[in-house]
Structure formats: structure tokens, C-alpha cells
Amino acid sequence: MENLLSVENAILITGPTASGKSALAVELAKRHNGAVVNADSMQVYDTLRVLTARPSEEEMQGVPHHLYGHVPAWAGYSTGAWLRDVSALLPALRAAGQLPVFVGGTGLYFKALTGGLSDMPDIPEALREELRRRLVEEGTDALYAELSDVDPAMAAGLNRQDGQRIVRALEVTKATGRSIADFQGRSGPVVIDADEARKIVVLPDRAVLHARINGRFEKMLQQGAEDEVKALLALGLPAEAPVMKAIGVSQIAAMLKGEMTRDEVLEKGAAATRQYAKRQMTWFRNQMDDSWQRLTH
């Protein structure tokens, strides 16, 4: 681990699910008087602590952790929202003399963190809430039809069932009178200078990773994932809500309805996690350049 000790303004750690990156983040944070900052798009939600593998109090080992479970399950949350939360958090960490240790499996978060993000306009909260309410009550087809009327070019490029992107495009059009496409080419400020950060991508051997995934999903069921999904389903969220797409939700929901056995949930949940990890590994290999240290952990 000695070659990981030379750092400047931040440590960035990414890798597939179940790769051991969260434990590495805690280890390095302890060495550098650091604070761990979540960079996983599912671990921001408050409802699914177990199912999204948010670190437990024991796993945190007394190290400060930020941006975990701070978003209600019903709320929309984007890469831009995460970047704004990070920008608001960093001054406090700097003032406390704490090194930010970013960790998570959402590659787009790291791209935005070090490369900037499209400079989108501010959206009035009332408008945002209205469109999300309409998404639940009216469904994606109605909002897609509305977007087709006001911004047909953008609508043509979207999946008509992608409620989150449809709502986002409508938000911008209604708030500004302009297409979201007008803003997507404008890049906002870089939050972390990639040249002044230690960057690590954890890429375990596939057999090791699969063994961890298989054991982890069973442990999640033992630790209360079923109760979490019950609580989530009780909220009555639309199927296209991001939190509803967390791996394990559909499988456990099927078990609760009597449509799947516990053994089938274990098999299908682990299989879905392995497929997700494979997609992550491919993305990291293709998107993370040689400035990212490859680490088997």
C-alpha cells in the first residue's frame, strides 16, 4: 500500500460492485485524516441501506462518511445534483483539514467530478415537484407526448419510457423556453483537478469477484433486504423511479408476491449483480485512462 500514500487534493476510488473499494476507502481515509464521500448513485437513497450495500457503522470504523442515504426514495437525483452536493461539502472538509476520499461505482460521477458537467439552468423546485408528481399520476406516455409538442427533436432522441430523462427535458424547456440540447454542450467547472488527485480503479479477478457477489446477496437477505423492499413498495413509486431499479428490488418484490422462491431470488439476484459488475468492469477499462492506477484488492 505504500505506493498509495502520495496524494494531493483528493483520493478517487472506483470499481465494480463487491470489489472491496469501500473498505479500501476507509483504510486510506484513516491513513490520511480523510472523510469518505459517496460516489454511487444508488447509495444516495435513504430506503435501501442493505440492498445497495451502504457501509454499516461498524464498516465505517469511525471515519466520517458523507452523501449516503441523504435523498428520499421518491425524489429525483441526477449527476448534476450530486456534483452540487459535493461542491457544497468540500469547503467544510477543507476547513476541517480532512482529505476527501471519493468512492463508488458510478463512473459518470467521476467523469463529472474531474471533467465538468453540462452547465444546466436552475429549475424552480415547484416546477420540479409538479413534473415528478405528474410522472407518478399520469405516466411516461403523457409527459412524452407533451415533450413531443414543445421539443420534438429532443423527444425523438429519447426512449419514450425513460421517465427521468423526459421529465428533465421538460423541466428545462418549461423553465427557460429553450431545449435542453442548448445547454448540454456547455461545460461547468471542474470540481476536482484530476492531475492533483490519486486515482484508483479496483479490478478484482473475475472468479474472486463472482464469489463475493454470490455470498453478498445471501447476506443481504439475512440482514433485512426483504423488509427494505417492503417499505419501498409501500411508497407506491412508479416502476421507472431510479430507486426501483436497484438490483434485488424486482426479485424480492416477486418473492413477496409469491411469484419466486427464496432460492430463485438468490440465484437471479446474484446473476443480475454479476451482469452489472461485468458492465462496470467493461466501462472502467474503456473509460479510465492510464492515470488511474489498476489495483487488485
Curated annotation (Swiss-Prot):
> Keywords on this record?
ATP-binding, Magnesium, Nucleotide-binding, Transferase, tRNA processing
Q: Give the reactions, separated by semicolons, that this protein catalyses.
A: adenosine(37) in tRNA + dimethylallyl diphosphate = N(6)-dimethylallyladenosine(37) in tRNA + diphosphate
Name the InterPro entries on file: Dimethylallyltransferase (IPR039657), IPT (IPR018022), P-loop_NTPase (IPR027417)
Record: residues binding substrate: T17, A18, S19, G20, K21, S22
Tell me which domain of life the UniProt entry assigns to the organism this sequence originates from: Bacteria
An example Gene Ontology biological process: tRNA modification
EC number, UniProt record: 2.5.1.75
According to the UniProt record, where is the region Interaction with substrate tRNA?
Answer: 40-43, 164-168
| Keyword tRNA processing applies | yes
**UniProt keyword Nucleotide-binding, yes or no:** yes
Cofactors demanded by this protein: Mg(2+)
Molecular function in Gene Ontology? ATP binding; tRNA dimethylallyltransferase activity
Kindly list the positions annotated as binding ATP: G15, P16, T17, A18, S19, G20, K21, S22
Q: Per the record, where is site Interaction with substrate tRNA? A: T106, R128
Q: Subunit structure of this entry? A: Monomer.
The family this protein is said to belong to:
Belongs to the IPP transferase family.
**Protein purpose:** Catalyzes the transfer of a dimethylallyl group onto the adenine at position 37 in tRNAs that read codons beginning with uridine, leading to the formation of N6-(dimethylallyl)adenosine (i(6)A).
Q: What is this protein called?
A: tRNA dimethylallyltransferase
